[in-house]
Amino acid sequence: MRIVEISHDECKDLLNRVSVGRLACSLENQPYVIPICFVYEPDHLYVFSTLGQKIKWMRQNPKVCLQADQVGDRSNWSSVVLNGTFVELREAGEKEHARERLAKFSDWWQTPLAERRERISDLSIEPIFFRIDIASMSGLRGISEAE
């Protein structure tokens, strides 16, 4: 297997094809990584969540990293890593834009709400839309030697 860099355009193409990534945030030198569903738009990712550890941490330290990939097998894969800034959407128009973008996936709202309901007895769940403003992005691809 060879590992090669992929272009910026290939990174964007991958982010358009996948909808799940691993979001890393940190607070007081402690990292926290969780899977999230997202939708890509040039220079941004849009995400829907509920109030929990990641939101609390990102409100205090908005610098984040996200990794997303598409894996065929151990020798055929593509991966993108991006660094960016968490921006909580507060204006109605911004939230509606994020909701419209996320609605391309029929189940975009289910995971955060289902997870939250299982962890709390108080069902007063605060929906939160946020954006990750992308500062940098790079990617790699694993290629089988047979190719």
Locate each region found by the language model.
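Active-site-adjacent structural patch at catalytic or cofactor/ligand-binding sites
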Residues: 50, 60-69, 78-87
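Short beta-strand segments
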Residues: 18-50, 66-67
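Charged, gly/pro-rich active-site loop segments
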Residues: 2, 74-147
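A generic secondary-structure signal marking the coil-to-beta-strand transition
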Residues: 11, 19, 62, 78, ...
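Short acidic (Asp/Glu) patches
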Residues: 49-52, 64-69, 109-118
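Extreme N-terminal tail/first-helix region
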Residues: 1-17
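Short, structured patches in soluble enzyme cores that scaffold and shape functional sites
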Residues: 27, 68-70, 133-136
